[in-house]
């Protein structure tokens, strides 16, 4: 993925191999790897997996940088209530709030096209920043500060990401890259 790209400072590339039978073990590996990478005081870029991968990364990042905001580019909120012990892709943001790692005011949902019925109450109870696709310019003007940026492929228009399981997105590539 990085082949042929030029950077103005050294870049480290690392891999975390998932335990396909144990999500909690995979999260532990990702967390520990992220903690180690943050010690080098360089930006961390993570590619691959569903949004459950973001959970351990965000735990590590927030503990090392308490002022960080979360910009969540996704067609969906991912604030469903957790069922069982596993932290799946659709509960990540809610889990981060419930654990006290992020205040809702530090979370910016961008590109949201669908709010699930079982997410409405939690959304109304919290003061999240919510920007639908037609409000992307408003987000660009209002947002300030440092951020962990998470991009779910389903935020893109279905013509740009036809293989996603949730084809509700409405952003084009230029909007996402800004």
Task: Please name every model-derived segment.
Residues 1-178:
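Conserved alpha-helical scaffold segments that buttress catalytic/binding sites
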């Amino acid at each position: 993925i990085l082949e042929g790209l030029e950077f103005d400072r050294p870049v480290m590339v690392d891999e975390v191999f998932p335990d396909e039978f144990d999500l909690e073990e995979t999260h532990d590996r990702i967390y520990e790897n992220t903690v180690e990478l943050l010690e080098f005081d360089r930006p961390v870029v993570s590619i691959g997996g569903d949004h459950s991968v973001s959970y351990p990364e965000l735990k590590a990042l927030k503990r090392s940088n308490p002022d960080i905001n979360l910009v969540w580019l996704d067609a969906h909120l991912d604030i469903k209530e957790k069922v069982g012990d596993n932290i799946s892709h659709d509960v990540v943001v809610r889990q981060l709030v419930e654990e006290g790692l992020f205040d809702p005011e530090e979370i910016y949902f961008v590109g949201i096209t669908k709010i699930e019925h079982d997410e409405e109450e939690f959304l109304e109870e919290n003061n999240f920043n919510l920007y639908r696709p037609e409000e992307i310019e408003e987000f660009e003007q209002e947002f300030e500060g440092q951020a962990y940026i998470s991009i779910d492929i389903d935020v893109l228009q279905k013509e740009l990401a036809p293989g996603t399981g949730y084809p509700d997105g409405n952003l084009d590539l230029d909007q996402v890259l800004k």
